[in-house]
Structure formats: structure tokens, C-alpha cells
Amino acid sequence: MEDHPVREEEDGEEDEGALAKSPLQLTTDDVYDISYVVGRELMALGSDPRVTRLQFKIVRVMEMLETLVNEGSLAVEELRMERDNLKQEVEGLRKAGVSGAQVNLGPDKMVVDLTDPNRPRFTLQELREVLQERNKLKSQLLLVQEELQCYRSGLLPPRETPGGRREKDAVVAMGNGEKEERTIMKKLFSFRSGKHT
């Protein structure tokens, strides 16, 4: 039984160590240790309703702290990986610079390996222009589709076209052409299947 109180003292010392750490050095294990210490101290205060409400708030704060620590750890790991990749790239460039002809490029220049299948094929400005044009065309298509739907449902009257014909007549004419094409297709398929109409 004496072993148990000694263990609690050791836990308390470890947990206080987690509280003494810099926020940037915290790990999720440290957050769990802090949570354990705070929970143990709240239990010692008793079962007052105010303590219970405070306990729920502390749990929420600990969850937020855990999330922040996890995100920070991920960001640090990503930066380490990027640093390692850059070191490898610099080392490769140094070896290539020693073995091949030295090319001195400015800070805004980039060397592109034409044999690399993942090389950039467009500038960022070209991509932006293409995306803007695509978005513009999408919005125009949506407007035309809405207008067509309104004409079909009868919400909008047909407009006069410059040739003096109404658009509805033009739409009907296109519909008739479609029907003729469909009947031709039906005849073709019925002929192939052995049915003659």
C-alpha cells in the first residue's frame, strides 16, 4: 500500500513538468498529463454543481489545447519534411553543378527539366486566365439554361429575333429537326433489327 502513494507523488512531479513546459514544446501526452492533474484536483474539491460546470469547461479547453498541439505537431513535421527535401535538392544541385556547366540564374528564374513529366506547362498567370474564362463561361451557361427553362415552362414570352421570327418558332423548328433525326435513327435501327416500318 505504501507503493501507491509514492507512485502518486511521482505522477505529480511528471505532470507538473508538463505544466512547466513551453507551449511550443507540448505534446499530446503532455496535454493528457495536464488533464489528469487538473481532473484529480477537481475531484478533490468535491461535487459542488459549480465545480461540475467548471469541469465541463476545463474539458473543452483541454480538447482545444489537444487540437492545437496536434496541428502544431503536424506543421512542424511538414516543415521538417520540406527542409529535408530542400536539403536533398540543394545537395543534388551542388553535385550537378560540380559535374556539369555552372549556370548562374537570377532569383526570379527557374530551371525546368523538360524530361520531367510533372514539370509545369503553364505559368500561373495563364492558369488564372483560363480559370477565369472557364468560370465566366460556366456562369453564362447557367444563365442560358435558366432562361431556357423559363421559356419552356412558359414563364417568359418568346422574344423577337432580328429576322422577324419569334424564338419559339426557331426552337420548334429545331425540335422538328430533332424529331426527324430521331425517326431516321429509329428507321435505321428497326431496319438493322429486321423490322420494316
Swiss-Prot record:
PROSITE patterns: RH1, RH2. This is RILP-like protein 2. PANTHER family: RILP-LIKE PROTEIN 2 (PTHR21502:SF2), ZINC FINGER PROTEIN DZIP1 (PTHR21502). Residues 119-184 form the RH2 domain. Residues 14-96 form the RH1 domain. It is found in: Cytoplasm, Cytosol; Cytoplasm, Cytoskeleton, Microtubule organizing center, Centrosome; Cell projection, Cilium. Residues 1-24 are annotated as: Disordered. The keyword Transport applies. It holds the Pfam family RH1. Involved in cell shape and neuronal morphogenesis, positively regulating the establishment and maintenance of dendritic spines. Plays a role in cellular protein transport, including protein transport away from primary cilia. May function via activation of RAC1 and PAK1. The gene is Rilpl2. Keywords: Cell projection, Cilium, Coiled coil, Cytoplasm, Cytoskeleton, Protein transport, Transport. The lineage of its organism: Eukaryota, Metazoa, Chordata, Craniata, Vertebrata. Homodimer. Interacts with RAC1. Interacts (via N-terminus) with MYO5A, the interaction is required for its role in dendrite formation. Interacts with RAB8A; interaction is dependent on the phosphorylation of RAB8A on 'Thr-72'. Interacts with RAB10 and RAB12; interaction is dependent on the phosphorylation of 'Thr-73' on RAB10 and 'Ser-105' on RAB12. Changing V61E: Abolishes homodimerization. One of its GO terms (cellular component) is cilium. It comes from the Eukaryota. Residues 69-153 form a coiled coil. GO terms for biological process: epithelial cell morphogenesis; protein transport from ciliary membrane to plasma membrane.
